[in-house]
Amino acid sequence: MLTLLEPPGAKRSPTVGNYNNRSAQHLLNLAPEEDDLYETYEETEDYAENEPTGNILTRSFQFLDQYLVGQSSSADYNDRWKREFRARPSWCDADLCLQQMNRGKATGNRYALYSRSLIQKLLFALGNTVHRNAWSIILAVSMIFAVCCYGLQYVHIETDIVKLWVAQGGRLDEELNFLPNIKEAMRNVTGDSGPELPRENGLGGGYQVLIQTPEYEGQDALAAGPLLKHVEIMKHIASFNVSVHGVDWSLSDICFKPAPPSVAADSAASSLGDVIDKIVPCIWITPIDCFWEGSKALGPHPSLPKSSLGPLGMLLSSLSDGDMIRWSDFDPIAVIDEIHRSFNLGSHYTFFERAGVSHGYMDRPCIDPLDPECPPMAKNYFDVCPHIDRVREIAKKYGTELEEEKKKDSGYSFFDFLGRKKREAGDQPKMIHPAQPADSIPTIEDAVPAQVPVSTAPIPTTTTLSPEEARAAEEKEKKQKARELKDYCKSYRKSAFEWLKKNKDKWPEVMSENMYPQNVDYAAEMTGGCSGFASNVLNWPEDMILGNPRRAKKGGKLSGADALQSVFLVASPADVFLRFKQKPGRNSMKTGLDMDAWNETAAEQVLQAWQRNFTKSLYNHKANVDEDGNERRTLHPLASTSIADMLEEFCQFNYTIILAGYALMLAYAIVTQARFDNCLPATESSMGLALAGVLVVTFASVAGLGLATWFGIEFNAATTQIVPFLTLGIGVDNMFMLLHNYRDVVKLAGGHAEMAILMRETGMSILCTSINNILSFLTGTLLPIPALRSFCAQSSILLTFNFIAILTIYPAIISIDLRRKKAQRRDLVCCLYGDTREESYSMISKPKIQSKRIIGAPSEASIMQQFDGITQAQMASSDDPAPWSLHSFIRYYYIPFISKPASKVAIIVGCCALLGASFIGMRQSTLGLELGDVLPEHTAPAQFLRARDKYFSFYPMFAVIKGPNIDYAHQQRQIDNYRQSIGSSKYVIKNKNEEPSEKYWLGLMRDWLISIQRGFDEEVAKGSFNLTSGTVIGSNVSEDARLAHALMCSHGSLFGCAGRVGKIRLVDASGIINSDGFYNYLTAWFNVDHMMYYVSQASFFPTPPKWELSKNHTENFIPAAEPLAYSQIPFYLTGLTDTAVIVDAIKDIRSVCERFTDQGLPNFPQGIAFTFWEQYLFLTGNLMQAISIITISVFCVISVLLFNPWAALMVVCILGIMTCELAGFMGLVGIKLNPVSAVTLITAVGIGVEFTVHVVVSFLTALGTRSQRTSSAVDRVFVPVIHGSFSTLLGILMLGFSEFEFVVKYFFIVMTALICIGIINGLILLPVLLSWFGPRREISPTGGKTTLTLPPPLPKNANSSRSGGDDSDEDDEPSGLVMYSRQAPPTTRTSGGNRGTVGNNTRRLPAV
């Protein structure tokens, strides 16, 4: 059949050239034979009814034929479309293929064609519907999308990193929520019994951390400079204040403090409750606790004057001479001893002994021995008094006059007199410098300088003094002289120390070398860690406070370290609220605080404000800037609010980056679709469609996010930083596929149902790619990481919306643009017409030529002369590839190249080498995800985490015992064994006895009971108890003994002393606590020794009831505590340097926990390591499961849509190769395997379909040999696939500008690599494999032909019910032009809807 574009004799005319996109395919040996373009139909060949048979298969075919065959007629299309059909029949119309198979003209995969026919008919109907109702479709779908967008107002961005990371519904989630769930179940209402230890929630919780890193490479942190710098930073933190609710708050207000010993209400010390609360220091874990300077930051803050102690402050001679109570000169044990001598402290005194509260910091060495306040008890104390005169002399010699410090006039009081008298009466310790021989110390007389005014008043001699009186007078004179010397030394002490610091080179003129101030060996002092003010219970392992500690030999003392770390424990909001809540009989703890507005919410606001300002203050500290003003970050703070605040800030949509990314995509889409005519957009240009396509995809993405919000899917960093760009890049792929086929279909359809044909021919590829993309992200939700589940779920929803939009709104817009083209209006500037509109004929817009006009041979030339120019102009842009275009390169260079056998072998060898390299990369791949990578660069939390990963391998953990169905009383030995088994792990820090370094509640309770038993035994020896009746008969029984009596009498709900007092032991010889009264003892220990309870970090729930010891021993029943539903044992882990080691430690400790759970002691571990690395135990299994599921899904989807398992298998094989190569690439470039990279591997399977399925579908639908079909497939789809690849690349390009390192590393880099790998495998390797092993074509003409002829037109009555005959505009009706054929068949041919007898020697030309 001829077309009006090619009259007889003009086919090979050089002026006509290649007139469609198959015209040059003779270069690829794909052009059909010229005689095959025409077919003469005989009436006898028209469809004969198949005789029904009993064959079930035949009957099924007949049933399917009834609905899927015979709905399309070859008369509906022009010759150009028929040319396309003959080369790739099933691509164009599976119905016509089945008609030819029924006629016996072809054989093939009937099942695939039935499936294809069904899908094509649905798509055809969709295209027709959209074309007829374009504006209605746009309005309706847009309204639905707009309703979905309404959900965006409910967006919630999740910033809790634990909720983002911990798998929901899994073992870890159950363990983290065990305590809240058990509290909810038991509904226990707790009173004001005291603060709970701040619970760590993964990255801090109640822990605020500071890391100090070296100022330059190689700096030793265990030197005076870094240590003193840390002291100053700690002082800065301790004195840092924020104003909230009109009140200033410092760290001491919100820090965690162990509860002070309880004081009975009738005690003389009860009025000192507020003072004791202020004196008890904050618990912080710091390396400077090894030294006296550690006390400087303890305060108290604000300063606590002695006057707050009332008369006691004046009477206590053990207090320092200053007006303020400070830990830097406070000797706790001296004060306690003095108070104990006056007021019997009872069990509280033994508590201080057990806790190791001795001299506080007074006996610890000084970092700087030239500090004027360095106490005499320090081992490197330097006494400057003997050298004061010499210092003054030498200083004056060099032009410096030491400044005398004026003595403060503090007045005089009676209490001061008493206090001083007591001090004078006491013996003062005589301090000897370590390097100074005792006999070399000058006597006081010798040390007093001549200019010191010494009292020389003669002793009255009116009476003769006895020898004793003379000696007393002499002694008094010496003391007077010593006091005067002390005052003199004190007045110049500070200035003398300052001069010595600045003039170390002058020391030889002042003193001999052996008397120089001596620095201690800092590394030796810090070996084994440091201790807080209670040295027996507050121990800080060196791995916790020192970064990368070094030793000269294993087991020896430290030789150095790289960093210092301090940890501040911050109380819970409930504790802060109770701390400042007005208490009966007590003064307000915070002046100016509005008690009416004071509640837990207000306390939480105080905590958050302080923590935020703490981080900001240290991050901008002057220590982070060098002398030249350049950033030199050495202080790295982290507060529990830091990560949440940072995530909330950076998880917001960055509209600048988003707009830039979308503008770049718009520019690319417009440039690729632009066609110009006289510097104006041509009619065949599609810039408007490209612009509309990007906007449609954007609108669909926004609507998808809105629906995701309706579904309750929370936003996170992946949502805001990745999803907009990734879905844009993937979503526009289908847009480019539609636009690429749009031009061809418009020319091929000949004005008949263009949109329906476009959807029918392109829809299959869109279905395959879109469904697989959606499924791949849905499969990603199998990974149990909430943040990644949200990301995958949102991506799948957005891709679904993109899919809907690309099948509804976008075709409707194309339909509107089609009318523009038919009207010959220019693109974008629709008010202008194309230059050729008036004088030319278009395939789309045809002049109204008389339908019955007969064109004879003599007028052929004149007719073609009229249309030849427009034909050349319209076809130049798409039919014949433009010179130097990508399509031209593909057709004329690339396809011939890959068709050569040598090239195929080279490609296979190269791809095998690439695959081999990927296997090497996979072997090098390691597990892990640096927590710093998931946070934005140049933020305080990210810098902190990187410093922590570099310098520290220390993590705290807890072993949690799950009640309440545990019999603690009878399972004590098992609990001890459980703790010992965990402690035996090589990762647990141990003490010198090879036991876990941290004491735990059962051991501390046991020690307390033993001390109580010891006090009881002493009273029994004195006869203070009647062991028969169990009564107290002594008059002055110690508090410990009375407490032991109450413990022995209380057992369960009973109180009976007879037969128990003196007969039972609170703790037996094997260390087992008496089981009868175990829960009674637990109550007593919790209330009496509760400071040890808090130190033990036991976190009991439910907490034991309140109880206090009464003076009436008959009223001392101790109520039993409820069985514990929750308790925990602390451990410290070290050596956790990387993910592999951490995972091994988790496995080791988990195995112990599981073993004891099987033995009847339910338990689980908890801590940072378990929270963030637990998923690595199951990552490989989850990854393999997800990849298997998506691979099977892809196989099933392609098999169902194409009904060709062999084609699906080839696609899956290529996808498998791509996944392996991507995994190998990540291993080679050092991208670790973790849940984030696992998502990219899973989605790579679905995204990889974009590079393969288009080629396979085109290959299946083409005719010819495998090589010819491969060449045809590459020629047809290479350009749109490349456009899709570049659009995806442009979409993810903006990810490279994200502040999040994990976005850049795990999405931008990996996705870019995926695109490159996809192009290599989909457009280079796959064509080679298809040319060798490709699946059989879906249909094969009989008789060995390489083209398939069309079936005869359907009878009018058979064709009347088909859609499409009147679906297009009026301009689409066939023109009815008739011309002579070059052959004169005896039959009549009809075209379009106008079928009639034309004559024996004529035939009607189809619409063009």
Swiss-Prot record:
Cytoplasmic topological intervals: 1-136, 671-686, 731-765, 817-901, 1197-1217, 1298-1305
Entry GO terms, CC: plasma membrane
Keywords per UniProt: Cell cycle, Cell division, Glycoprotein, Membrane, Mitosis, Transmembrane, Transmembrane helix
InterPro entries according to UniProt: HMGCR/SNAP/NPC1-like_SSD, SSD
Single GO biological process annotation from the record: cell division
Biased composition (Low complexity): 1387-1408
Domain SSD: 654-816
Transmembrane segments: 137-157, 650-670, 687-707, 710-730, 766-786, 796-816, 902-922, 1176-1196, 1218-1238, 1239-1259, 1277-1297, 1306-1326
Tissues with expression: Germ line and its progenitors.
Region (Disordered): 1-20, 455-479, 1342-1408
Gene Ontology molecular function terms on file: hedgehog family protein binding; hedgehog receptor activity; smoothened binding
Compartments (UniProt record): Membrane
Extent of Basic and acidic residues compositional bias: 468-479
Extracellular side, ranges: 158-649, 708-709, 787-795, 923-1175, 1260-1276, 1327-1408
Family label: Belongs to the patched family.
Note: Membrane proteins Patch and Smoothened form a receptor complex that binds Hedgehog morphogens. Despite the lack of Hh and Smo homologs, ptc-1 is still found to be functional. Absence of ptc-1 leads to the formation of multinucleate germ cells and sterility.
Reported function: Required but not essential for cytokinesis of mitotically proliferating germ cells.
The protein's name in its UniProt record: Protein patched homolog 1
Species of origin: Caenorhabditis elegans
